[in-house]
Amino acid sequence: MEHCILSLLPGGDDVEILIVDDGSKDRTAEIADEYERKYPGIVRAIHQENGGHGEAVNAGIRNATGLFFKVVDSDDWVDYEAYMKILKKLRELAGGDTVLDMFIANYVYEKEGVRHKKIMRYSSLPQDKIFTWNEAGRFHKGQYILMHSVIYRTQL
């Protein structure tokens, strides 16, 4: 979990890190509170009874104060260069006239001890451009967008 948090901190004041302690029996609550004390205004600890992954995500959405929301599980981390590139693009888009509902990026499965990375690419979607669902084309059976690849707008 700490690797995840440390990978998100370079976002600075532009990023609000919500750590949802979903009734964990490990040190999650303690670690969340520690980071909230160390990084006030950036990290917030949310404590709740266990409701499963979906309820933890919903708690994050309910408590988010920023314009965008992204799920990063505690055993995941973000690549620094990709993260900076995405934050730069989101800043540009937030300052413009275009209202962005979702930002979809490739997602890399990189398991420790496994030699090959698996990259989730969305070849049926237009690349490097803003598009509507009408332009997205059709998804085939078995195709989906992985939740971890999406950054969602929090406001209508």
Placement of each model-derived feature along the sequence:
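Nucleotide-sugar donor-binding/catalytic module of glycosyltransferases
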Residues: 1-156
